[in-house]
Every structure is written in structure tokens, then in C-alpha cells.
């Protein structure tokens, strides 16, 4: 299965059969190389990936400055140290799950809820971890 298939079928999927889906998603290597992304995913800046990776290594690193992705600033909210970073901006937000080799990104806007975004992103992330990826 290609990485694009994971994005198209497992991240940009219909959530809970409600006809809702994430606003954007991607699978990105720890080095910032994009493995696959939805057409709506923002253009990443190298320093944004560097900051995200540092927060996984040193939880709380992004809290004072916020999480920046594609030039958009998200307020960092509760996550799981070394595993998940979550951010909020207005009525939407972001979930980033770290696997052995990749970062799985999900960006949502209402009516999708933070919990739905977390579920979609973390489910794929956990699967990739189980596959040694």
C-alpha cells in the first residue's frame, strides 16, 4: 500500500459514518520529508518540523511559543509526552502522532471534534508503530 493510500483512506476517511473528515492530513518523515499528504495540507517549513521533533524529545518546548505549521500558529494543549502533540486554533486544531520513523498529522475544523481527530490520527499512528514504522 502506498503512503498516499494511507492518507486518502485512513486519514481523510469518513469519520463515524457522518460524512465528516479532517480538513488536512499528512505523513512526514522525522527529517521533514513529506511521504504523502492531502491536497489541502499546508507547505511545511524546516524549522517547524525541527520544533515539533524537539517537543517530542523535550515535552513542553513548544508551549511558550506555540506550534507553527505552514505559518499557522496553534496553542499547544495536552498531549502525551514523546508520543502525541495536540494544538488548538479557534474552532479547529491539530493532532500529531510520532511513530518510529514518521509523524502523522491531522488538522480539523468544526464540526469535526478534537476527539475525532485524535482517534483518526492515533489509530493510524499506532498501526504504523505495530508495523515497525
From Swiss-Prot:
GO cellular component: cell cortex; cytoskeleton
Keywords annotated in UniProt: Actin-binding, Allergen, Cytoplasm, Cytoskeleton, Disulfide bond, Phosphoprotein
InterPro entries the record matches: PFN, PFN_euk, PFN_sf, Profilin_CS
Residue interval(s) of motif Involved in PIP2 interaction: 83-99
Coarse class of the protein's main subcellular location: cytoplasm
Stored Pfam families: Profilin
Subcellular location: Cytoplasm, Cytoskeleton
Disulphide connectivity of cysteines: 13-117
MF annotations from Gene Ontology: actin monomer binding
Something else known: The variability of the residues taking part of IgE-binding epitopes might be responsible of the difference in cross-reactivity among olive pollen cultivars, and between distantly related pollen species, leading to a variable range of allergy reactions among atopic patients.
UniProt subunit comment: Occurs in many kinds of cells as a complex with monomeric actin in a 1:1 ratio.
Annotated protein name in UniProt: Profilin-4
Species this chain originates from: Corylus avellana (European hazel)
Amino acid at each position: 500500500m502506498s503512503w498516499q493510500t494511507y492518507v486518502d483512506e485512513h486519514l481523510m476517511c469518513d469519520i463515524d459514518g457522518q460524512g465528516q473528515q479532517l480538513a488536512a492530513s499528512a505523513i512526514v518523515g522525522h527529517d521533514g520529508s513529506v511521504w504523502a499528504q492531502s491536497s489541502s495540507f499546508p507547505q511545511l517549513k524546516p524549522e517547524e518540523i525541527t520544533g515539533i521533533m524537539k517537543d517530542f524529545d523535550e515535552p513542553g518546548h513548544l508551549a511558550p511559543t506555540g506550534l507553527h505549521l505552514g505559518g499557522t500558529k496553534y496553542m499547544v494543549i495536552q498531549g502525551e509526552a514523546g508520543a502525541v502533540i495536540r494544538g488548538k486554533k479557534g474552532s479547529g486544531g491539530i493532532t500529531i502522532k510520532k511513530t518510529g520513523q514518521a509523524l502523522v498529522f491531522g488538522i480539523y475544523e468544526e464540526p469535526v471534534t478534537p476527539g475525532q481527530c485524535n482517534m483518526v490520527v492515533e489509530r493510524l499512528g499506532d498501526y504504523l508503530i505495530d508495523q515497525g514504522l
